[in-house]
Curated annotation (Swiss-Prot):
CDD domains per the UniProt record, alphabetical: Glyco_tranf_GTA_type
EC identifiers of the protein: 2.4.-.-
Keyword Glycosyltransferase included in the entry's annotation: yes
Descriptive protein name: Uncharacterized glycosyltransferase HI_1578
Source organism: Haemophilus influenzae (strain ATCC 51907 / DSM 11121 / KW20 / Rd)
Keywords: Glycosyltransferase, Transferase
MF (Gene Ontology): glycosyltransferase activity
EC category name: transferase
Xref: PANTHER family: GLYCOSYLTRANSFERASE, LACTO-N-NEOTETRAOSE BIOSYNTHESIS GLYCOSYL TRANSFERASE LGTA
Family: Belongs to the glycosyltransferase 2 family.
Length: 323
């Protein structure tokens, strides 16, 4: 690519001596060479810093920021985002491996498509022994796909995070213009919150190829803090659903078992809204006779027989009747 713009790659590392050499080497060996590599050592107590100092001697593009104390992942990430210089910034985890063409393929696409604010890719899975709950669902070499186009990504965000944070490359001007940060109020799912906000500022996209290898092991956030991550993700999902409902003219502050009662007649052709209602009926914070009667009167006809049976069975199991 001619006139290659500077890309800043930000890596946060805490006690990552086992993986950090391979991770940083995969960035150094990118086919795209105009890089600024910022590594935040978050008060590691193992040999992470020593490894970083040795590898930085081999490549002047590497800048090490070392926190005196462990400040946590979100704080460290925001420190890195506060001092990068590139036209684009990328994120990668200290235990993952970028394929050589990761940055070149995405930046080339972004340079040709000005309307896209940020772009990621599929992931290739690496499963290690004792890799926790998520690892049991995959095997090494599996490809973790996500929607490719903005509208499909936004629709998926109502129900889960369709963005692989460690593959994303974003335009710096949008990040700076809107003074974005990774929010500490959303621990263990801060990336889901961040990309939900970015999706309302510009177009997101995913490259249809696995450009980063994602390592599953027992010490990562999704394994150690799986319950907390799920609870935070549930909070973000409800915020995203509320935003969508407000956007289509349904005035609800927070979607829950009470506000669900404010949704009456629904356009059967709106597949997204039907999916939202089904999701909410299957995950109410409180199941009551009132909610059941509302479902039967207004929403029963929206769903097929299988979905209706699942919802009714959920009410039967969960309903709280005060005698």
């Amino acid at each position: 690519m001619e006139n290659c713009p500077l890309v800043s790659v930000i890596v946060c590392a805490y006690n990552a001596e086992q993986y950090i050499d391979e991770s940083i080497s995969s960035i150094i060996n990118q086919t795209y060479e105009n890089l600024e590599i910022i590594v935040i050592n978050d008060g590691s107590t193992d040999l992470t810093l020593s490894h970083l100092e040795e590898i930085s001697k081999l490549d002047k593009r590497i800048k090490i920021i070392s926190n005196k104390y462990n400040l946590g992942f979100i704080n460290s990430l925001n420190i890195g985002l506060g001092c990068f210089s590139g036209k684009y910034f990328a994120r990668m985890d200290a235990d993952d491996i970028a394929k050589p063409s990761w940055i070149e393929k995405i930046v080339t696409y972004l340079e040709k498509n000005d309307h896209i604010t940020a772009m990621g890719s599929y992931l290739e899975i690496i499963v290690e022994k004792e890799c926790g709950i998520i690892g049991s669902q995959y095997k090494t070499g599996d490809i973790w796909k996500n929607p490719l186009l903005h509208n499909d990504i936004c629709e998926a965000m109502l129900f889960y995070n369709p963005i692989h944070n460690n593959t994303m490359i974003m335009r710096a001007n949008v990040y700076r213009e809107h003074k974005l940060i990774f929010n500490k109020d959303y621990p263990y799912a801060e990336d889901y919150k961040f990309w939900s906000e970015v999706s309302r500022l510009g177009c997101l996209a995913n490259y249809p190829e696995a450009l980063v290898k994602y390592r599953l092991h027992g010490n990562q956030t999704s394994s150690v803090y799986n319950h907390e991550q799920n609870e935070t993700a549930k909070k973000i999902k409800r915020e995203n659903i509320t935003y969508y409902l407000n956007k289509i003219g349904i005035d609800i502050k927070v979607i829950n078992s009470v506000s669900l009662l404010e949704i009456y007649h629904v356009d059967k052709s709106n597949k997204v809204l039907k999916s939202i209602l089904y999701e909410m009926y299957m995950s109410l914070d409180k199941y009551t006779i009132t909610s059941l009667l509302h479902f039967i009167k207004y929403h029963l006809e929206l769903f097929d027989l299988k979905q209706n049976l699942k919802i009714i069975k959920k009410f039967i199991r969960k309903i709280n009747v005060i005698f």
